[in-house]
Amino acid sequence: MKSAVETLNPTRVRLTVEVPFEELKDSLDAAYKKINQQVTVKGFRKGKIPARVIDQRFGRGAVLEEAVNDALPKFYTEAVNEAELNPLGQPEVDITELKDGETLNFTAEVDVRPTIEIPDYSGIEVEVDAVEVSDEDVEKAVTELRERFASTSPVERAAEDGDVVTLDLEAKVDGEVLEDGVAEGVSYTIGSGELLDGIDDAVKGLEAGGETTFTSELKGGSAAGKEAEVTVKVSQVAARELPELDDDFAQLASEFDTLEELKADSRKRLENMKQYDQATQAQERVLEKLLELAEVPVPEKLLEDEINTRKHNLEHHQLGQMGLDLEKYLEIQGKTVEEFDAETKEAAVKGIKTQFVLDELVNKEKLNVNQEELTEHLMRRAASSGMSPDQFAQAVVEGGQVPMLVGEVARGKALAVVVEAATVKDTNGEIVDLDDEDETESTPETTEAAEAAEESTEDKPEA
């Protein structure tokens, strides 16, 4: 076999392959054997039909077609390996010449990973939010904790903001009660915004036994996005009573003895949360700068497939679970189809570029993933998917997606290398030190930042 490669553009090549006919012998033998098992000829036992009889009865062309179909993947793979290519997706194969007893010639066009020059990233500078926790932040956190320990007691008066009401609901569209539009005994805190638009105004002022009707656009269910006539009946009004903010409350709501200790712990927790957000922000902005510096051509077919994958995942998984179609989703978002398509393409391009650049950086820095890192990442992914670690691991193995997880961790480590080399300042002009670990150690934040940019570039395990 002889092969040559022609570069059509930075992301696509054409392989030209010439195969001497004698190298098709194994495939021809396999073709005769396969046809032997599929056909019957009077006078011959199944599987014992001579080759010349098959040629006479079914045509030599049928045998050659079967042999070529069997041989093409092998010769294509050999040509790819000889040229040291990294193909993306399936090739477009064209048989240019097939002469019985002489030769098989074909071409194969395929997208390939582009050659990427990793830029000097040591000069990257980004700005992030400063970690600042005010007294008001602490008071808000303590108040939210206090709200969780509130008690309720029924009252004989009209409902008002902050009350907990027990409701019976019935929704009609075009005069018909929806199958999924009836609910009884729903507990709702007035002002929380957790139910339908307009329900707060509807129930305020009603006492137990009171009933009213209002209109609201349904956000989910079988009639999502439609205007519904909602009848609401109040069966109980209960006032919420908050515990006193004192040392007794601190002992009730936490492991601390005093309110001051509880507030100090709340401040520390808020600082930790803001530091986490700050680190994530730094990683996302460093990645954006890196992608701006790198020249990364994107294969057209890969981009097309990625856009289609993202749209499919949105329509058939995310929106399907919400009871929405794409048209209604865009209406809620206030976007046109053109705006949605542009945003989807932009996200797909970023995802592909992120994977290409970080993969190249993994190779350049010779980064490896050990078993402990892979296990930790698997545990995080399992938790975020709502599956147990064992279930998630089984889904990954059965789906042949272990290399995908390894790639995610490796790219997280590559991003960590770039973040380590970057200068990160907060909005106060202070240098932010994110170097709590070895520079080549991936953190949950760097891995998640890389994943967020890639999003659906690779298949994900399904529950």
From Swiss-Prot:
One Pfam family in the UniProt entry: Trigger_N
GO molecular function, one term: protein folding chaperone
Composition bias type Acidic residues, residue spans: 432-442
Residue span of region Disordered: 427-463
Uppermost EC category: isomerase
Record-listed E.C. numbers: 5.2.1.8
PROSITE patterns named in the record: FKBP_PPIASE
Keywords: Cell cycle, Cell division, Chaperone, Cytoplasm, Isomerase, Rotamase
Record's catalysed reaction(s): [protein]-peptidylproline (omega=180) = [protein]-peptidylproline (omega=0)
Compartments it resides in: Cytoplasm
Keyword tRNA-binding: no
GO BP of this protein: 'de novo' cotranslational protein folding; cell division; chaperone-mediated protein folding; protein transport; protein unfolding
PPIase FKBP-type domain ranges (all copies): 162-243
Entry GO CC: cytoplasm
Main location class: cytoplasm
Coiled coil: none
Top-level taxon: Bacteria
Family the entry assigns: Belongs to the FKBP-type PPIase family. Tig subfamily.
Protein task: Involved in protein export. Acts as a chaperone by maintaining the newly synthesized protein in an open conformation. Functions as a peptidyl-prolyl cis-trans isomerase.
Free-text comment about domains: Consists of 3 domains; the N-terminus binds the ribosome, the middle domain has PPIase activity, while the C-terminus has intrinsic chaperone activity on its own.
Protein name: Trigger factor
Organism in which the protein naturally occurs: Streptomyces avermitilis (strain ATCC 31267 / DSM 46492 / JCM 5070 / NBRC 14893 / NCIMB 12804 / NRRL 8165 / MA-4680)
Top-level taxonomy: Bacteria, Bacillati, Actinomycetota, Actinomycetes, Kitasatosporales
